[in-house]
Amino acid sequence: PSGPDGMLPARYLSESLDRLGISLRRFKTGTPARVLRSSVDLNRLERQCGEEYITPYSYYTDATELNSRTQSECRIVYTNEKTHEIIRNNLGRSPIYSGRIHGTGPRYCPSIEDKVVRFADKSRHQLFLEPMGRDTEEMYLQGFSSSMPEEVQRAMLASLEGFEKAEMMRTAYA
């Protein structure tokens, strides 16, 4: 076991809190896979640019300096019937659907499995490919959180347009 983003786990924390009489609940994090930017064909994805002028949140932030920076672009990609078929064919392998994981998931960010099952009438679901930072090749595929096994996640990822050769840096987890 590990913590988020490769951090060390907080071993025995739950047991310690339980001994103190604090009731615990499990919340599912709904974290998507991370992919290597250079392995994705960005030219096949829709560009999602930021605002032309960025208004700072704080009076202490210099708006001129902030707006002189080059913004990092996001991209939009959509799931497709092949993606949905892979998910439907592997629902029994999902800890969330097999009952191995119990917990409350994020209200507005369902896993991709949940989207495919709950919104079966939709032929596609919008995903956002977001840079994790300026100095990293790591990209975050927002809207694609999953509890599927790694090999299923890899197949799901490869089914997306522009992701046929995508390298997964970190798997998604529930």
Stretch-by-stretch model annotation:
Residues 1-174:
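Residues forming the flavin
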